[in-house]
Amino acid sequence: MACLGVLPDSVGAEMPPDRFWYVNHSCVVAAANRYAVTVQILEAIILVESEGDPHAVNVNRDGKGDRRGPLSLKQAKALVAELWKTGANFDVGIAQINSVHMRHYKIDPVHFLDPCINIQWAAFVLRQKINEYQETWTAVGRYNGSRNIAGYSWKVYRALERLAGIRRARGLLR
């Protein structure tokens, strides 16, 4: 994986608390190109879903998520393996891929702790939603299975604006 590097601490106040979203930018670009989705929206989804934490694990119960962590890779692997065995509904990794997809495609959830694999799946899921709903923001709203489609879309939109502000401050966006 090509890495663009971590940005200087002098701009830490504007950065999301976890900088993995930037370190994995090359994976986001590759996935966005492969599935014809917008790089910026994919990065905003990552910021909303995990703040860029590749080891994020969220257990879903009664329509609400229970975020576990922060976790080391070893801890995340153990937790994901246990959740998989018990048949729990959970989300894994940087873009919080849901266990429903893992069961459907018969993929060991530990693979989704790799940020680039996880991001590829995020782009795949988003592309499926865009194809199904024929409208980007409706697709974004349905990305995480939320019943509050408009609320989730707005959350992603606000993250998109936040990331655009960071890019502008760095001279990456004019």
Regions inferred by a protein language model and the residue ranges of each:
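Sec-dependent N-terminal signal peptides
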Residues: M1-L4
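Catalytic glycan-binding domains that act on GlcNAc-containing polysaccharides
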Residues: E14-R174
